[in-house]
Amino acid sequence: VGFAMNGFGFIGLGFDQFEYKRSLYLYNSNFDDWEKMNSMGSTTGQGLERSSAVAFVANYKAYIGTGQGGNPYLRDFWEYNSTSNTWTQVADFAGSSRREAAAFGILDFGYVGTGIDSTGTLKKDFWKYDPILNTWTSISDFGGTARKQAVSFTMGGQGYVGTGDDGSFTNDFWQYEPLTDSWEQKADFAGTARYGATGFGIFPNAYLGTGYDNTLSYTNDFWEYNYFNDTWVQVADFIGTPRANATSFAVGDRGFLGTGYDGQTLDDFYEYTPILSVESQFQIKSKVYPNPVKNELNIYLNNSIEVDELMLYSLSGKIIFQETKIVTNNRISTNVTKLASGMYLYSAKENGRVVAHGKFMVAK
């Protein structure tokens, strides 16, 4: 499993071609350095070794569970506190024991679903974990077919699940909205259908690649998904060997990917820096002037359109402002006096479709 928390990346558990593991390592991207942390369950965790588990971050802690080890189908869950480097067992996953499931964390909650259970049944149920109450609650089933080995990650305030093995290779891609407990199908992944891929979100883009595809080949292609446009474009190939079951995470505006299997288990690791050019993907070019902004945000459009909604976001994708607006002389204006200094994103919609988006800075 892999996850990012408190500015660091973490990789743990797995199978090294000889045995199941429960070890955990912290990656410091500032120094390109790995540090061994306490293994899952700490000194009393013997027997917790596993692979095909899931992990999510919620309420500033990581949660790891399910998978296969001495028992091929597990449902126990463990909380990892990176500040104290300690493990605490929490409530078992409320669904059936399983492996190769999907998971993501959104703010204070974790979400786990899909996978394959001990009867060989592919699953599409999904469950929400509340760390404060230490309880699991059934939520809406995954919107696609039951499957295992799907990609899952968080971007902004939503969760994403896609690709995977439902008895065949898949390329569908779904967004989970926690506010309405609903799944919405997004544009299909533009690469070949596959399972065992990996992905991470750096709002407003997500990145998905590698895996084992419908040509019966390990892959190293990578693709960028844009939140605003619901579109995929191919980006630079992963520079390691083609592989499946790799692990990845994002720290800040950089992605990190490694390990996996290409006929043998791997331990190499790579950094990916996206070209963060929001303007290159505009349907309609727009410009903020002046930028930085102090009290009033002015967005200038190069085409005459009837914008009916303006939304402002934090860099993590959280919606912080939403307002009906009217375009005057190709300009949208709004008061941002209440915004703290920092970088923000905006999107403008016409008839429900995003027609322009970009970044701006507030400087008080």
Predicted region positions:
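Kelch-like beta-propeller repeat domains
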Residues: V1-I275
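Sequence/structural signature of beta-propeller modules
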Residues: P274-I275, S280-F282
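C-terminal outer-membrane/trafficking sorting elements
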Residues: Q281-Y289, V293-K364
